[in-house]
Amino acid sequence: MEGAEAGARATFGPWDYGVFATMLLVSTGIGLWVGLARGGQRSADDFFTGGRQLAAVPVGLSLAASFMSAVQVLGVPAEAARYGLKFLWMCVGQLLNSLLTALLFLPIFYRLGLTSTYQYLELRFSRAVRLCGTLQYLVATMLYTGIVIYAPALILNQVTGLDIWASLLSTGIICTLYTTVGGMKAVVWTDVFQVVVMLVGFWVILARGVMLMGGPWNVLSLAQNHSRINLMDFDPDPRSRYTFWTFVVGGSLVWLSMYGVNQAQVQRYVACHTERKAKLALLVNQLGLFLIVASAACCGIVMFVYYKDCDPLLTGRIAAPDQYMPLLVLDIFEDLPGVPGLFLACAYSGTLSTASTSINAMAAVTVEDLIKPRMPSLAPRKLVFISKGLSFIYGSTCLTVAALSSLLGGGVLQGSFTVMGVISGPLLGAFTLGMLLPACNTPGVLSGLTAGLAVSLWVAVGATLYPPGEQTMGVLPTSAAGCTNASVLPSPPGAANTSRGIPSSGMDSGRPAFADTFYAVSYLYYGALGTLTTMLCGALISYLTGPTKRSSLGPGLLWWDLARQTASVAPKEDTTTLEDSLVKGPEDIPAATKKPPGFRPEAETHPLYLGHDVETNL
């Protein structure tokens, strides 16, 4: 196809930038309007959880948008084009994550009425564990947000000439502005708009690509003939980058670390008015994730079919797989000015949603875990002012450190999942130990966190220094045999019918023994390694140092106690006594909206304590 063979670099035009600017302006307008409506925020709880009065549908769509950033918009289609439609198994991993979150983590966090996830670690273990979890979260979120902001700007610059700093500053300043002014409500409602933009962008690309390639049956037939319809890949080899098992086992644990215990997500579902609505939000989130991932994977298959005889990676038109998607958009919409701008808006909608989520969440844990424990008597208005200031500082910091993500190799999708897997995987193990193993103690969980982080970081660094070969990872073949344009750069020797990239492993005599075994494990297993190491080490050390007695634990901290737990922290107007809660049921009771200064939910002072009536002082 002519567009597939063109050697000159295409660029975005005025109409494209106009569409992009419109998306930024609408996002800003929504965020400011929601944030300033009804007099703004009167307390830190209003700023971070919207007063715990949010509806299920917008929260669910916000949950879906939070980790569906430009990294996924660019990375998922590229991976599907290179590895096939088996990428759809990720949806199964996400479904398992949603079920486990709804059954295990959500009830505990919601009924405790926490704003910061890491408050749980202090209630269950000690302040040292809480601070350790907070620090790990802040580091992981800073790195992840850096990838989300910088990588798409770099990729679009390399393909289209889009100015890196213009895109960084425009998106960074705008999301910092509406997050600082509007808080949680602004983040949620702009996320809803941005999910719609992402889906419309994918569907327009799908429709145009399928039409150009002769219809859906022709696309499926060509993809099948080139091994891209490969859902039945059940290879148990953990070194295969993508199989049913990597998505369902490794992928579900990575997503669980993002949704089950990650501050950004927990902060959203505890903002719902009732526990039942919070679970409904997770269901809406699952539907949103399925639509986004399925649309992105199908775009990848259409993209492969479009370039099947003239792979731009082999011909030198692009330098990395992540650049496939913007090139495809410019090629198939070259005669439709303004439509490529929709893709630009699609990509940066994901960036805005993730960055704003991260900024708000980092401000929340800083206030709840570092400021309020030391200054419990701060007035609500002062806390709001501090929260807004922290949002501005974190937004500025994310912009400043975004360039660090350029040090990560292997593609933006791998980079983002590696960061979350390495750092958040051990945290998932710590929370799971706390909720499921009554015997686990502070020395045990701290030892487990250290061991889990060390193991997952070891394999991630090893894989970066000694990357596995494409044959080991399972990259499918591509071709440049159909290229005829003289302006196309010459392919490397033997490039036809092969994929260009990392050379096959095993040829370098200097590679360590682990290079083709332990270091070659799929990056989706990094989180599982960290989680399992944390749990095993934490359990062992706990029993060796003297297990915690179950009777010494406060109510509401163990999952096993949920069956006999009959109440949750609730506003006075909704429930004032234990008898009321028995009638209404825990899933209908909203989480607490306010707590007295210096409140510490422990043993007999905790509203969940079964020896007292459930009553809050509002």
UniProtKB/Swiss-Prot annotation:
Residues 1-14, 81-84, 158-163, 209-243, 302-335, 409-411, 466-520 are extracellular. It is found in: Cell membrane; Cytoplasm. It catalyses: iodide(out) + 2 Na(+)(out) = iodide(in) + 2 Na(+)(in); chlorate(out) + 2 Na(+)(out) = chlorate(in) + 2 Na(+)(in); thiocyanate(out) + 2 Na(+)(out) = thiocyanate(in) + 2 Na(+)(in); nitrate(out) + 2 Na(+)(out) = nitrate(in) + 2 Na(+)(in). GO terms for molecular function: sodium:iodide symporter activity; symporter activity. Glycans are attached at N485, N497. Na(+) 1 binds at S69, V71, Q72, Y144. The chain crosses the membrane at residues 15-31, 57-80, 85-105, 131-157, 164-181, 190-208, 244-266, 279-301, 336-363, 387-408, 412-437, 442-465, 521-545. The keyword DNA-binding does not apply. The modification Phosphoserine is found at S551. Residues 32-56, 106-130, 182-189, 267-278, 364-386, 438-441, 546-618 are cytoplasmic. Keywords: Cell membrane, Cytoplasm, Glycoprotein, Ion transport, Membrane, Metal-binding, Phosphoprotein, Sodium, Sodium transport, Symport, Transmembrane, Transmembrane helix, Transport. Iodide binds at V76, M90, W255, L413, F417. The keyword Metal-binding applies. CDD domains: SLC5sbd_NIS (cd11503). Perchlorate inhibits iodide transport activity. Oxyanions inhibit iodide transport activity by blocking the binding sites for iodide and one of the sodium ions. Its main location: membrane. Na(+) 2 binds at Q72, Y144, M258, S416, F417. PANTHER family: SODIUM-COUPLED MONOCARBOXYLATE TRANSPORTER, SODIUM_IODIDE COTRANSPORTER. Monomer. Belongs to the sodium:solute symporter (SSF) (TC 2.A.21) family. This is Sodium/iodide cotransporter. The gene is Slc5a5.
